[in-house]
Amino acid sequence: MQFVALLAALGAPLALAASIPAAHNNSSIIDVKLAATGNSMIKAIITNNGDRTLNLLKFNTIMDEHPTRKVKVYQDGAEVQFTGMLPRYKMSDLTPDFFVNLGPKASVEHSFDLAATHDLSRGGKITVSANGVVPTAEENETTITGHTHYESNELTMDVDGKEAAAVEQSMGGDSPAGVIDKRSNIVTSSCRGNQLQMLKTALANSARLSKAAASAAQRNPRKFQEYFKTTDSSTVQKVVSRFMSVARESTSTGKTTYYCNDTRDGCKPGVLAYTLPSKNQVFNCPSYYKLPALNNRCHGQDMATTTLHELTHNPAVVTPFCEDLGYGYDRVSRLPASKAVQNADTYSLFANAVYLGC
């Protein structure tokens, strides 16, 4: 597992990168081992192999406490359907409870049930593995100064399908249908106060930014290379098609259903909005409405790009749907082309950069 040193904190504008000290080089610092502890139960053991204490941000990692995509599960060479949530987290004003403080050579365990976020009712042999990136801060600090990669062992399990099917799905059941705006597919009965108008504005801005980003992807190869790490024509066309799909979904009735508020208890602290890709549903959280409609800061979060980000998580809009492989400009700018094109934040940051001329 290799560590990638960063020059700036998550979300910081490119112009500031040169003024921020480089992060520590923590080569091979985090080790992750997976072990089966039950029919579909997994225990992840995360070890700090370094010689100094690290603060590890839990968001979208193996340590995430929410029903997120912590591992990849395969059966007979095909990926098992993920039924959990893909959240967008607020990356500013991070608090200590979002981190795991891990001393030198120390370990922490995190257990979760695969059957709560995957359809394992078929039963049989599956293979499970995890890989990703953990944003890191210094001991007792919450400012992101680096990232460390991790890649686990590959675990083989023989699952009892009936026992797995009896496990309650974390995000299972049907969301209340409510009253739906036929033009936007917003569940208007889920909206309070001026939330409906704020969401409609965000969708309109998402469409505008997506169309501009699609145009820039074809006309500005230098900017495209900066974010997507290639100017290959097939990748350009894929990105253009995806931006235009987001634009269409933002302006007319599509296959996603958008809720102004949470109906599934997914809006935990730090979550701006989240998507259930297995259902093509998007839910806003209270913190979403505290964001600006459009941010005037390069790579800053706002309602428009959060909506754009979440729409790329929906397979009805983007196939295969985008994941959360890296957050913020500094991490996004270091993703290889194969991952950049599948990373939701790459699309939202590129759209923001085109809009502001970053």
Swiss-Prot record:
This is Neutral protease 2 homolog MGYG_02351. Binds 1 zinc ion per subunit. The active site is at residue 310. It holds the Pfam family Peptidase_M35. Secreted metalloproteinase that allows assimilation of proteinaceous substrates. Shows high activities on basic nuclear substrates such as histone and protamine. May be involved in virulence. One of its GO terms (molecular function) is metalloendopeptidase activity. Residues 18-183 form a propeptide. Its main location: secreted. It comes from Arthroderma gypseum (strain ATCC MYA-4604 / CBS 118893) (Microsporum gypseum). It catalyses: Preferential cleavage of bonds with hydrophobic residues in P1'. Also 3-Asn-|-Gln-4 and 8-Gly-|-Ser-9 bonds in insulin B chain. InterPro entries: Fungal_M35_metalloproteases, MetalloPept_cat_dom_sf, Peptidase_M35. Keywords: Cleavage on pair of basic residues, Disulfide bond, Hydrolase, Metal-binding, Metalloprotease, Protease, Secreted, Signal, Virulence, Zinc, Zymogen.
